[in-house]
């Protein structure tokens, strides 16, 4: 009989957070983020309390599920490391994803073509996504944000304390949030593990793909030798080296002039 202890969902999630360095904050500390900091390391980096991270993650998932239409939830990431994560989160939950630059006025200017009216906004970083957070305050839209130790909490309704600068941390947080949303909706039972891997939410550098493709092309086997092919045989050089007189093969009829009667 195995003595291995079965982890609870909370312990399992926190263990994954430790692996992906969700608890690693920054050396700077926002005053309102003090409640989420567990301690400060010797090098000055603040360590985030993952128990509070898990609690806020559960709260955020319940708020997302409370929105009747999933398309009314907009998830934003101006940070490149979060672009793939927000797209995958939107794919599995039915939300709208905006990866990259935020067009100013999307929540306030009804004239522009990209104007939207969501009921909930999720941002990857309230500092890099400050424009969308500011517009949501004008439109009275609640905001859920992944907040690091130095993140401003102005206009943020639910702050999920975590490392929002590492690509592994961002991918895991959106994966856990999407998993909890699917659990609450009943799309997958809690007794069953989600078959989607965290790697699907992980950002990948396009340059690495290009280098990998070049390496594969260089390592690819060359074309088979065409020695046995009939088209690869050498031409007979003896025939080309013969000196023939073209006039010798001409018949006598060619030398005679053509008469009018023959036409």
UniProtKB/Swiss-Prot annotation:
Pfam entry (one): Ribosomal_S2
Entry annotated with the keyword Lipid metabolism: no
Major localization listed first in the record, in broad terms: cytoplasm
GO terms for MF: structural constituent of ribosome
Keywords, in A-Z order: Cytoplasm, Ribonucleoprotein, Ribosomal protein
Location of the region described as Disordered in the Swiss-Prot/TrEMBL record: 237-263
Chain segments annotated as transmembrane: none
Stored InterPro entries: Ribosomal_uS2, Ribosomal_uS2_CS, Ribosomal_uS2_euk, Ribosomal_uS2_euk/arc, Ribosomal_uS2_flav_dom_sf
Subcellular location: Cytoplasm
Assigned GO CC terms: cytosolic small ribosomal subunit
One GO BP: translation
SUPFAM superfamilies in the record: Ribosomal protein S2
PROSITE patterns: RIBOSOMAL_S2_1 (PS00962), RIBOSOMAL_S2_2 (PS00963)
Job of this protein: Required for the assembly and/or stability of the 40S ribosomal subunit. Required for the processing of the 20S rRNA-precursor to mature 18S rRNA in a late step of the maturation of 40S ribosomal subunits.
Subunit record text: Component of the small ribosomal subunit. Mature ribosomes consist of a small (40S) and a large (60S) subunit. The 40S subunit contains about 33 different proteins and 1 molecule of RNA (18S). The 60S subunit contains about 49 different proteins and 3 molecules of RNA (25S, 5.8S and 5S). Interacts with ribosomal protein S21.
Membership in a protein family: Belongs to the universal ribosomal protein uS2 family.
PANTHER family for this protein: 40S RIBOSOMAL PROTEIN SA (PTHR11489)
Protein name: Small ribosomal subunit protein uS2
Lineage of producing organism: Eukaryota, Sar, Alveolata, Apicomplexa, Aconoidasida
């Amino acid at each position: 009989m195995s003595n291995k202890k079965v982890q609870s969902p909370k312990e399992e999630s926190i263990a994954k957070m430790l692996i992906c360095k969700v608890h690693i904050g920054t050396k700077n500390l926002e005053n309102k983020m003090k409640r989420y900091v567990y301690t400060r390391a010797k090098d000055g980096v603040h360590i985030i309390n993952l128990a509070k991270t898990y609690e806020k993650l559960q709260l955020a998932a319940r708020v997302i599920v409370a929105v009747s239409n999933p398309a009314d939830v907009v998830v934003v990431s101006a940070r490149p490391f979060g672009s793939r994560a927000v797209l995958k989160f939107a794919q599995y939950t039915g939300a709208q994803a905006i990866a990259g630059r935020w067009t100013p006025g999307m929540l306030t200017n009804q004239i522009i073509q990209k104007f939207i009216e969501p009921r909930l906004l999720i941002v990857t970083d309230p500092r890099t996504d400050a424009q969308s957070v500011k517009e949501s305050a004008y439109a009275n839209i609640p905001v859920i944000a992944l907040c690091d130790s130095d993140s401003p909490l102005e206009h943020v309704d639910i702050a999920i304390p975590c490392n929002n600068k590492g690509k592994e941390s961002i991918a895991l947080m959106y994966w856990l949030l999407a998993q909890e949303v699917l659990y609450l909706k009943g799309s997958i039972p809690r007794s069953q593990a989600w078959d989607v891997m965290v790697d699907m939410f992980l950002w990948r550098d396009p340059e690495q793909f290009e280098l990998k493709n070049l390496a594969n092309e260089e390592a690819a086997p060359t074309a088979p030798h065409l020695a046995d092919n009939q088209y690869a045989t050498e031409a007979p050089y003896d025939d080309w080296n013969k000196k023939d007189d073209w006039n010798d093969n001409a018949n006598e009829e060619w030398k005679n002039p053509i008469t009018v009667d023959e036409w």
